[in-house]
Amino acid sequence: MQPATLYLDNAASTRPADEVLEAMADAATRWFGNPSSAHSHGAGATRALEEARAAVMKALGTDVGQLIFTSGGTEANALGVLGAAALARGRHLITSAIEHAAVLRNAEKLATERAFELSTVLPEPATGVVAAEAIASRLRRDTAVVALMLVNNELGTVQPVAEVARALDAFAAREGIRRPHLHVDAVQAFGLLPVRAGTLGADSIALSAHKLHGPKGVGALWLRPGARVAALWDGGRQERGLRSGTENVPAIVGFGQAARLASAALRAGTPDRIAALRDALEAGILAAVPGARPTVTGGARAAHIASLAFPRLPAEPLLHALEARGVFVSAGSACASKTSGPSHVLKAVGVDDHTAVLRFSLSRQSTAEDVDAAVAALAGAVGELSE
């Protein structure tokens, strides 16, 4: 008999909400026209598109700037980083060692293909937080782009984006130059904690629908008024000329609906409930598994991610033992779990090759019963591997 399934890998992807699937099905049947078409079918698709755009911007707490729909968070990050760099005079980019590969690999692309110089800032190993002062100390007159994520997808740590924005403002005022473009990867934050474009101080913000019970294959890049990026490719020049290609209206409608639902959950205090579940999960695991410890401590964290280290235990067998008990989690992150050894993020906070790190990530659908079941399953899995 198969065990009941307990999905605790929501930082990798979430189950689409029923309301999202219904909205997408409706859009697919009603608004199948091309938004660029001049007839009524095109006009209907355009209305659906713009209503979704307004919903996502409202969830960002803004009605100014531009929101460009993309194929997901990876493309949104690429547009923010590469697009800003393409228009910059400087050839210096600052980022952190714990960014998602969608940012780090595009930064490396700028170094190899456009002779950019990269400054990569390490986090504090104990907290997993990148100090704003460490970024500020690397600013130069030729700094073109600063890229910093809001919530780390493996550790759950919240990075000091607003503080970095203030440091950029102060540097630009002191030097009498244009402020470097600040790009923020908010994929693991949007819809999960309050993200307000006006208070972050970012020039561009990357978002993704499937992290907040929306569909895969759709994301967005928000640009503050006056911020400019170059398109990654050309064509029909949809999305304000910045993202050519016929828009995926059903997916975008689903994104808009997911943003509405996430906003309602935030207003209802859902992050506090999820944080309480996370704390109970961590406490239960630490009590049940000798030697287990939090991967990082002391820094601000998003409510939904618990990252725990298990010295002298192998990550992959532990994952498989949990799956055999019906519990699905990630080793570090889904992006790194198919590689050997710790991810670049875990290495940056000092995790060695002999320590397993599991990421348990909750959602607004998680319950106290889920927590109890996860703790019991993990205790059984560790006991099995320790025999």
Cite the ranges covered by each PLM segment.
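Pyridoxal 5′-phosphate
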Residues: 1-387
